[in-house]
Amino acid sequence: MLGLFKRAPKLEAVFRPTVAVARELTREVEVAGELVLRNLGRAAELTDLELVLIGGGTRRIDLVVPEAWRGRLRLGAGGELTAAVAWKLTLAAPMRAPAAEIQVNTTAGGRHQPLATTPAFPLANE
């Protein structure tokens, strides 16, 4: 009964890209940098995280979650998780987008629930 009234944690996601390129002709996307997830509320327990790259506001591409972020994570009030990430993905269709953002979701409880989204960062097109 108490689980019905459980609030989603107040999280903030920040991505500092070192590489962010969409290669339209080869159907590739390469994104690398530092991803930070901050807890702005009280202590929270995070499980079943997933990351999604949103290109141009509509294109959604699943990303591999950093190894340290898998499983059950305890994030104290004011705490943060930091990971150096690098993804190079081959797409089924070409993508041209001026900007992208990374969305952090959870699938705990059988539903996709967005937890935080990074501010948009420029995505170079080659």
What positions do the PLM features span?
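Short acidic, flexible loop segments centered on an aromatic residue
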Residues: L40-R60
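A beta-strand/beta-hairpin structural motif
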Residues: L63-L91
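Short beta-strand and strand-turn-strand segments in soluble, beta-rich domains
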Residues: E12-V14, G57-G71, P114
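Short, solvent-exposed loop/turn segments enriched in Ser/Thr/Gly
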Residues: R27-E34, T82-A84, A99-E101
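Short beta-strand elements
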Residues: R111-E126
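Short glycine/proline/serine/threonine-rich loop/turn segments at secondary-structure transition edges
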Residues: L91-E101
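Low-complexity, acidic Ser/Thr/Pro/Gly-rich terminal tails and inter-domain linkers that flank the onset
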Residues: L2-T26
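Short, acidic/polar linear motifs in exposed loop/turn regions
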Residues: R38-A43, L91-A93
